[in-house]
Amino acid sequence: METAILVAQLCATASLAAWLTIGVKDNILIPSLNEPYTADVMAMVEMEKEYPEAHAHVAHRAITNRTVQRTAFYIVVSMELLATVLLWIGTIALLMALFGTATVDTARSLALYGTTAFTAVWSGMLIVGNHFNYWFSHEGAQNTHYQMTLWGIGTSILIVAGS
């Protein structure tokens, strides 16, 4: 049973690592895929267009300074990169534990650091997005952030419960 649990933990952690690797790679190499949308959320552009009365109550929250918007985007990318590295370290450690070249407790701890960082990235997006009321006009992004948060939590539970 211990081997099956380790395999499940390994696959779940590696899946998070692989998924986030693609995202962070694109954010580094092709920032135009996401950065303008981050700026749009921070400036509350769509909310102002689609829900002007609601926007009037929270318009003071908008950040339109492009330097601040870009800086925020690259802070997020840095956090994604950190989470990706931690996830791959956890994945490698779990693989090593599976083959007896690392302790299971250490491997699970390292994987848990990665899943915690992954979850923090996406829950952070939910929190910041909430500040900018992004549910008014960016439901798809909010849904993705919820799904990623839940995926991270689920993987963390698998690691802890399987200990």
Question: Where do the model's predicted regions map?
Answer:
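Long, hydrophobic N-terminal alpha-helical segment
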Residues: 1-67
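Extended, low-polarity transmembrane helix blocks
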Residues: 2-26, 74, 85-163
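Short, charged low-complexity intrinsically disordered segments located at boundaries
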Residues: 54, 70-72, 154
